[in-house]
Amino acid sequence: MTEFRSGFVCLVGRPNTGKSTLTNALVGTKVAITSMRPQTTRHTIRGIVHRDDFQIILVDTPGLHRPRTLLGKRLNDLVRDTYAEVDVIGLCIPADEAIGPGDRWIVEQIRATAPKTTLVAIVTKIDKVPKDRVAAQLVAVSELVGDSAEIVPVSAVTGAQVDIVIDVLAAALPPGPAYYPDGELTDEPEEVLMAELIREAALEGVRDELPHSLAVVIDEVNPREDRDDLIDVHALLYVERDSQKGIIIGKGGARLREVGTAARAQIEKLLGTKVYLDLRVKVAKNWQSDPKQLGRLGF
């Protein structure tokens, strides 16, 4: 009988390299926020992959980057702390972008912080380029990480090679117990997941500066007194400037209604029940650089 393996895998890379989409594909359901805007993941989301002979706990970190705000520095510290605590690091590099200084800097950070941790290089977004481009990127990644790291191409969107990535990561794990019961897919509290789903809906189609300036806090979750099949969710969306508040709300409140409709559909899937979603937008000036406000908003 094969020995059961289990452990923690950290997916790292520059912002917007497909880490959250890959986490969701590996787990088989949505546990991490995805957005075309960089730097949208702010919590270490753990997704859990269950099989008969192994269990992978996936840690989806913010993209490592050179920070410009106190929030950025705290996100980087979170990533480095995670490096030191996991069994395998999965370095995500997209097939459709040339390797640059940012990728080299991250490899240096990994080597400095966790020199003995197993490194697997994952070439993401292979559905976006022809096969010859994928092959060229595999060679370039091999030169970047060296012979000791295994390299796997994958498309989280189409599902191509997702099972191979799972097998490679599982093979690198040590023997160990199942940390989570079968069927549990994430250890994030439901309120955190709800806040992330609202944030994802609010980020769709907005200007580049907004992702960094938007935080969502779930204020209250209550079952409706006169209805067993309805839950009331009240959430606050914090931005840094009045102009950003206008972007979120839109003309006559149209955009906020769209955000509410999209987020409510996702939250109803998460909770398995009907939801009344109340969204309010508030300005918390320069919260990204204010330690007290960062703490209040969960950072």
Curated annotation (Swiss-Prot):
Main location: other
Entries under InterPro entries matching the protein: G_ERA_dom, GTP-bd, GTPase_Era-like, KH_dom-like_a/b, KH_dom_type_2, KH_sf_prok-type, P-loop_NTPase, Small_GTP-bd
Residues covered by region (G5): 154-156
SUPFAM superfamilies named in the record: P-loop containing nucleoside triphosphate hydrolases, Prokaryotic type KH domain (KH-domain type II)
Region described as G4: 124-127
CDD domains, per the entry: Era, KH-II_Era
Region called G3, residue ranges: 60-63
Keyword annotations: Cell wall, GTP-binding, Nucleotide-binding, RNA-binding, Secreted
Pfam families (UniProt xref): KH_2, MMR_HSR1
Binding site for GTP: 13-20, 60-64, 124-127
PROSITE patterns assigned to the protein according to its UniProt record, in alphabetical order: G_ERA, KH_TYPE_2
Domain KH type-2 span(s) in chain numbering: 206-285
One GO location term (cellular component): cytosol
GO biological process: ribosomal small subunit assembly
Compartment(s): Cell envelope; Secreted, Cell wall
Protein origin, superkingdom: Bacteria
Region (G1): 13-20
Residue intervals of the Era-type G domain: 5-175
Region named G2: 39-43
Alphabetized HAMAP family for the sequence: GTPase_Era
Functional description taken from the UniProt entry: Exhibits GTPase activity. Binds RNA but is probably not involved in ribosome assembly in mycobacteria.
Oligomer status and interactors: Monomer.
Family of the protein in this entry: Belongs to the TRAFAC class TrmE-Era-EngA-EngB-Septin-like GTPase superfamily. Era GTPase family.
Protein name (record): GTPase Era
Gene coding for it: era
